[in-house]
Amino acid sequence: GGEWFTLGFMGNFQFKLNDPIRSTELGISAGLSIPSILFIPDKLFITNVPRTEINIGYNYQNRPEFTRNLISLSYGYNWRSGERFFYNLYPLQMNIINLYNLNSSFYESLKDPFLRNAYRNNFDLGSGATVYYTTDASTIPQNSFFYARWTNDIAGNVLSLFNSSLPVDTTGARTIWNTPYAQYFRT
C-alpha cells in the first residue's frame, strides 16, 4: 500500500469585454507514486522511504501569437538520506512541443535566442537529477534555515547515436516524428 495517484486539471482564460482577442490555456496531468524503487534493489534504500514516480501531462495554449501543444512524460525516483539530503533521479524525461499558427512578427520581435527557442517545435528525450540539502526539513520551519539545490539535465545525446538513420528537416536538424530533437547538458 501507500501508492498515491494524482490527477490535476488547469485552465486559464484571458479576455477583455468587447475585444475579440482571447487567450486560452488548458492542461491535464496524472501521476502515480509508488513507495518503492522499481527495477532497483530496495536494500540500497534501507534508511528511508524511496518512491518511484511516473508522470504524464498535456497542455494546450491558444494565444493570438501562437497555438502550442505540450506533452510530457517522466519516470523517476526520489528518496532522502538522513534528515537533510533529498534526491530525485529521472532516467526518463520526455517533452514534445508542437507549435503552429505562429505570428511571424511576434517571432521576429524576440531577440533573445533562448526565448526564440521556446517558440519552436521540439522533441526532448533525456534524463535529470537533483540533489537538495537543507538545514531544516520540517514542514513549517520555526527558525531561519539554509538550503542548496543542484540540478542536472541531459537530453538528446543517446538519440545522436542514431543521427545517420534520422530524417533531416529543411534547416538541417535531425528529427523524430517531423520534430527536431534537443541536445544539451545543463546544470
Predicted region positions:
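Membrane-proximal, glycine/serine-rich, low-complexity loop/turn segments characteristic
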Residues: 1-4, 21
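Transmembrane beta-strand segments of outer-membrane beta-barrel domains in Gram-negative
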Residues: 8, 12-14, 20-187
